[in-house]
Amino acid sequence: MAFEALTGINGDLITRSWSASKQAYLTERYHKEEAGAVVIFAFQPSFSEKDFFDPDNKSSFGEIKLNRVQFPCMRKIGKGDVATVNEAFLKNLEAVIDPRTSFQASVEMAVRSRKQIVFTGHSSGGATAILATVWYLEKYFIRNPNVYLEPRCVTFGAPLVGDSIFSHALGREKWSRFFVNFVTRFDIVPRITLARKASVEETLPHVLAQLDPRNSSVQESEQRITEFYTSVMRDTSTVANQAVCELTGSAEAILETLSSFLELSPYRPAGTFVFSTEKRLVAVNNSDAILQMLFYTCQASDEQEWSLIPFRSIRDHHSYEELVQSMGMKLFNHLDGENSIESSLNDLGVSTRGRQYVQAALEEEKKRVENQKKIIQVIQQERFLKKLAWIEDEYKPKCQAHKNGYYDSFKVSNEENDFKANVKRAELAGVFDEVLGLLKKCQLPDEFEGDIDWIKLATRYRRLVEPLDIANYHRHLKNEDTGPYMKRGRPTRYIYAQRGYEHHILKPNGMIAEDVFWNKVNGLNLGLQLEEIQETLKNSGSECGSCFWAEVEELKGKPYEEVEVRVKTLEGMLREWITAGEVDEKEIFLEGSTFRKWWITLPKNHKSHSPLRDYMMDEITDT
């Protein structure tokens, strides 16, 4: 029961997944099984070198960035970095989901029938299952999580597929819980992609042939197996040690020197890993801890054992049948740092140092959770919320009553309230910059970046306070000294807040903010090729409503002919910004606002055809 509560799968589903994974060896691409309310898709593994490291990929680890259009969630929202995956595994997925196969139609049928879908596979078939699950989540589940059933991904001895961003994105979207990866203690396959291609290229073809269960037996005297195992674990050791140094903030001089010129594998564990020993199953869902365990569970206790482990690493890849059959007789431990981890790690042969590193990874996650709690305590405090409320409910309305709005009032800063607003602006910036610092250093849980309450607060803050930052920037003439606000002055806290909001509202449609923006611009019929428009709008403020005033400031000092495309783009975006709450309609059309004063100077022909003419009818009539 504890296992099912943690992973969402029971023994029967695991048994059926393994059975389907075996059947996939006999099919081309994938095998489908259906029983009751569950449909299982099992993927055929390959033991060809090209299906582990794509021969056309020249990088040291065969990696490639995911397509942002096809996988819009698989990135860091704030920084915008896209997840990296193994290209050979990705090509296997692309071959499966090719419209010429029956796979997509079969998935569609299961979706319409409201059946739970399980993706599974052994070895590299498990890698395909992982990517197929992400494909399903992006294509179906994210559109309406209340309608589409949660998928499950169950793998047996699968290699690592994606990088830390891949793992982070799954955590942020709360998808990590859908992935359960079974690993026997010495199985080499989950460690293979931690090695450089150059380290294993000579021995990999032979070892893959030995890993194929359709081969008769492992050649235990084969020196190439020992060479392969040694190379993989040497690179795994470097990756694990570098990772723990980054995690704890310590630095071993030799590792610092190594990392400066030696490329390290980008691949990292994702989801829940279930390590198996003779006595127990040990479940871990902390990616940093799993990485350490992939190295330290594969170590020998003495010289005699060391000589046997390379061949055990092959045999263990063939032992998942035994694992599945014996699950009901084994103890179950969840390695979360709350309970004693000694017995679990002892069974897995983890050394004292290894236990320290695993514990450090678990403790680091606790610190992330504590950091999040502290942030929540701060932003829920009455004095914090009062700062936002004062700007929103007192300062802004009083400025609007004077017919010039809070942007223009703050830009001049002649009143005592303007000074008070500046103090509150600085105090709020301090809080949000502290959060940003924690995000950049990965010192918050993955889920935080996608937390709806945080996104709402950050959006409220951005919409309300960024105009004050823009006013302050131009009041001090920084645009003349430093350059345009959008190019040189925009604080990162607003960029992160903007991207978080855009991701939240667009992900149900599987869309990317950048593409949505350019589609809107293209629909404005500006009379230029899109490439020309993109060059013209580079670093403009038309991509975000809270940057409205920055764009106005840039446009008002330039001849209309020079900025016509930017003017029309700004006008074309404005109505939607007003509807969405990005721009305050009452603020920008006030009699004394910078925007209104600038707009009335535009050519009469432009004004008479402007989408804003209804708002500015008096000005058009007067001119």
From Swiss-Prot:
Phenotype when changing residue 189 to M: No effect on basal resistance
Domain of life: Eukaryota
UniProtKB keywords: Acetylation, Cytoplasm, Endoplasmic reticulum, Hydrolase, Microsome, Nucleus, Plant defense
Record annotation: effect of changing residue 254 to A: No effect on interactions with SAG101 or PAD4. Loss of interaction with SAG101 but no effect on homodimerization
Subunit description: Homodimer. Interacts with RPS4, RPS6, SNC1, SRFR1, AvrRps4 and HopA1. Interacts with PAD4 (via N-terminus). Interacts with SAG101. EDS1-SAG101 and EDS1-PAD4 form separate complexes in pathogen-unchallenged cells.
Subcellular location per the Swiss-Prot or TrEMBL entry: Nucleus; Cytoplasm; Microsome
A Gene Ontology term for the protein's cellular component: endoplasmic reticulum
Protein name, UniProt field: Protein EDS1L
Example GO BP: defense response
Molecular function as annotated in GO: hydrolase activity
Modified residues (N-acetylalanine): 2
Induction: Up-regulated by salicylic acid or upon avirulent bacterial pathogen infection.
Residue numbers annotated as active site: 123, 187, 317
GN (gene name): EDS1
Domain remark text: The N-terminal domain (1-384) is necessary and sufficient for interaction with SAG101.
Taxon lineage: Eukaryota, Viridiplantae, Streptophyta, Embryophyta, Tracheophyta
